[in-house]
A protein has these predicted regions:
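Conserved acidic residues
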Residues: 51, 104, 206
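Catalytic P-loop NTPase motifs of RecA-like helicase/translocase cores
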Residues: 79, 113-116, 138-139
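Inter-Walker segment of RecA-like/P-loop motor cores
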Residues: 54-102
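Hydrophobic "anchor" residues on beta-strands that sit immediately upstream
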Residues: 70, 105-106, 130
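Conserved helicase motor core of P-loop NTPases
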Residues: 3-5, 10-36, 120-127, 132-296
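Hydrophobic positions on the alpha1 helix immediately C-terminal to the Walker A/P-loop
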Residues: 39, 43
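Walker B catalytic acidic pair
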Residues: 109-110, 133
Length: 301
């Protein structure tokens, strides 16, 4: 494959780091379409030993597999293991027998999502870690940033020609350069005015992203009302987003879960207890207890 001069320099820098072994982490950052994953896959082919590909979410791991990174999995599944407990749900502990302990290299995509606890657990294996990140990517609302709190060792800025044909990448380039995007259709994406957003448009969507918590609350209340929900507490089948890590239960900030069973609402303690199922792994079902204020709009008061 023909590499650009910038990509050639990146390959040489990572190869030199692998030879030196003077630091455990190498930060290869770049905008979308600059070829970070392609470079990492090429480097992995030349490593003497096993290379593990991982990402924070299952969706990101599936994208890695689609790009030719075999066995890519979530970081949680790579380094933690379930342990039987007396409760209804298993607990998760660091797996010292993880393949991460014997690998020659760990490659982590979308590293901005990794927080300090997960990052330190990853580094505890002593394995060299190549982290891939995009400085233009929005960071998580809470947590994350363990690997992005330092300057990149290599920063890729040249978007290759094939990527420029992708409408989403073209839009991201325009926004990054301060340009406004006119209303219209961009591949499978559409940009419309605020006045054009109606109930039918919203109800066809899988998710709605907004910029403010008060907007989120208003949209959630309206959508749930349109769906026939009258109680502020979650119902079976609804989707929830995890806001805080709980390693013992296998909960990660930003993960999405489906309510399987609403158990109890204890008014004295003002806690909601329910069973939830991971959207990424249907086998992962846990029992959680959450303060009621997270569902009735009082979490920030």
């Amino acid at each position: 494959m023909a590499w650009s001069p910038q990509q050639d320099d990146a390959l040489a820098a990572v190869a030199a780091w692998l030879r030196r072994r003077d630091t455990q982490v190498f930060r290869l950052f770049g905008y979308a379409g600059t070829g970070k994953t392609t470079l990492a896959r090429h480097l992995a082919e030349g490593v003497d030993g096993d290379v593990i590909f991982g990402a924070f979410t299952g969706k990101a791991a599936s994208v890695l597999r689609a790009k030719g990174c075999p066995g890519a999995a979530t970081l949680h599944s790579l380094i933690y293991r379930a342990r039987e407990s007396e409760g209804e749900s298993p607990t998760f502990v660091l797996n010292r027998e993880s393949p991460a302990a014997k690998a020659a290299l760990i490659v982590i995509d979308e590293c901005s999502m990794v927080d300090e606890e997960l990052g330190r657990d990853l580094l505890s294996f002593g394995t060299p870690v190549l982290v891939l990140g995009d400085p233009a990517q929005l960071p998580p609302v809470k947590g994350g940033g363990f690997f992005t709190d330092a300057e990149p060792d290599v920063m890729l800025t040249e978007v290759h020609r094939q990527a420029r044909d992708n409408p989403i990448i073209r839009m991201s380039m325009a926004v990054r350069e301060g340009e406004s995007l006119p209303h219209g259709t961009y591949g499978e994406s559409r940009i419309i005015g605020k006045r054009d957003i109606d109930a039918e448009t919203v109800m066809r969507a899988d998710q709605v992203l907004v910029g403010l918590n008060r907007t989120r609350r208003a949209y959630n209340n309206r959508i749930r009302n349109l769906m026939g929900f009258r109680d502020a507490m979650p119902a079976a089948g609804e989707k929830l987003v995890c806001l805080r890590n709980n390693k013992q239960k296998g909960l990660l900030n930003g993960g999405t879960w489906l309510v399987k069973e609403f158990a109890t609402s204890r008014s004295k303690k003002k806690v909601v207890t329910m069973r939830v199922q991971s959207e990424e792994d249907a086998r992962h079902v846990v029992k959680v207890s959450v303060p009621q204020e997270f569902f009735d709009g009082r979490e920030e008061r």
